[in-house]
Amino acid sequence: MYDRAPRFTQLTLSSTTSEIGPGTYNINRSLGGDRGSYAPFLSLSIRDSGFLGSASALHSPGPGQYNSDITRNHVLGGNSLQNRSKRFDDVLSDVPGPGAYNVTNDVSPARKIKAKSPKITSKAVRPSLSPAAPSIPSPGQAFGYEEDAQGVLHKHKVPSRDHSLGPAFYSPAPEELWSSQKYKGVQFGKMSGRREPLKGADEPGPGHYELQEDQTVQYENVNVKREQRSRSELSIPRYHELVPLQEEKKGVPGPGQYYIKSQFETSSNTHRPAQSPPFLSQAQRFSPVKDETPPVGAYNDPRCALEILKKGRALNKNPFGQTAVRFLPENRSKATPGPGAYNMFGYGLAQESLKKASLQSSRKAAFGSVAQRRIFLPSKEEMSTPGPTQYKVEKTNEALYKKQSTAAFKSASDRLVVSLFAKDTPPPGSYNVSQSFEKTQCLHQYSKPRNENARKRQSCFLSAASRNTDVLHNDPHTPGPAYYSPDVKSSSTLALIISKEDRFKDPKDEVPGPTAYELSPVIMDTVLKGTFNVTLHNPLMSSTRSLSSHRSWRKPTAHSSA
């Protein structure tokens, strides 16, 4: 680390150093001397050139031997647009156009055969049918006629028509440029080829041998090093150095925190009389806008007394040896009353006046003064002076319109109704909320009837059926009650609609209950079953004996009657 030997920062890429080159060789000595061996560098091994990566690179093709069409067709990166066919092909109709028909001039061979067959010609002279131009020419006769020297009309032939397709029917494939087929994105992300590193031979080359050591002395300027040391460098403290610096900075007070006493300050008089509150009131003039109601959980609930046991009992380090609370919260649970701790009847006019009277009696001074008030004893001169009510003030004549009373000032009723005091209203527990809610919001329950006649009549008014049903329509053809015969009973057709019986009745369980069974009189009053133990008194045996004796007593009567 502290060695002064030169460091080689740049290494040569080839197998030779920069000391070997043109001008460094001694040609005369090499030509004149005898060669001891024809092998270069005393070695007959094959040396690979450093410019060729491997021997296989010699057999690789040159730059003009590649087929560029393959690379043009294979566009890297354009995977989403592989289909080059047209989305909408040109619609070509298969129906021939108006000039696509070819009308032949020769007569069909069937007509020629008919013409050659011998026919019976009539002796009557037929007029010669000379072709004439038709009034409405067909498409084959629309090119005109030419009159011969003999006056025979010859039809013009149809001109030769070019049947090749026009320019609208061609669809040549446009030759796409190679620049338009290239992928415009990043290409190096998809390359998989690697560049072979250029490695030289492992054998040492000429010039790598140091036959003579370099013993030159290197000089260093000490003054230059001192100038470099004096330069200011950025010093960033580490974490273990930064922590004590921050802790030392906390104990130093900031600017403006010093309080220097001045010699011109007014000394505070501690013996002056205490100032009483103005207007004999100690109430706060301007109450804060902030709501003073305690938040949720601020009450001292005795149910939370076991939470103290959850806290740790380890002794905390008290600052300055004090255990008092330094910062008291604004809303303390002790100062705020809990739910149900308010006294509604204690805050009234009588309580406030009693509080003011006791407060004024305890104070000695009035109007904020502590000086002793002397007793007022008037002298003779002061007694002779008239008082405030002994003067006679002359009454001025008022206008007549001021003496007349109007309706606004003549009425003795209050214009603004004063709200009732809180003490006149009943407390919140005096109302029966449950009964009032059931009568107003729930179903109305009628009072019970007082006698039996009222109980019979009550069923008429408690019916939920409509009195005037919409089912019975007024029909003039329907007979009235006087048209019916009392002997014939007519069955009403609307019985299914007017009937109030339930369509779907509740299923009744037809299984007999526990009281439906009848026990025999023998086992009715006992739970004991038959036993073979003679020592126990078995009531069954006595009952069976009585029954057998009763039967034997009735049998001879039957024989005697017979």
UniProtKB/Swiss-Prot annotation:
Biased composition (Basic residues): 551-562
Record keywords: Repeat
Pfam (any one): SHIPPO-rpt
Keyword hit for Transport: no
Comp. bias (Low complexity): 127-136
Region entry Disordered, spans: 114-136, 192-215, 543-562
Basic and acidic residues: compositionally biased ranges: 193-202
Source organism of this protein record: Danio rerio
InterPro entries: CIMAP, SHIPPO-rpt
Lineage: Eukaryota, Metazoa, Chordata, Craniata, Vertebrata
Name of the protein described by the UniProt record: Sperm-tail PG-rich repeat-containing protein 2
STPGR repeat windows: 21-31, 60-73, 96-118, 204-227, 253-271, 336-350, 385-409, 425-462, 478-492
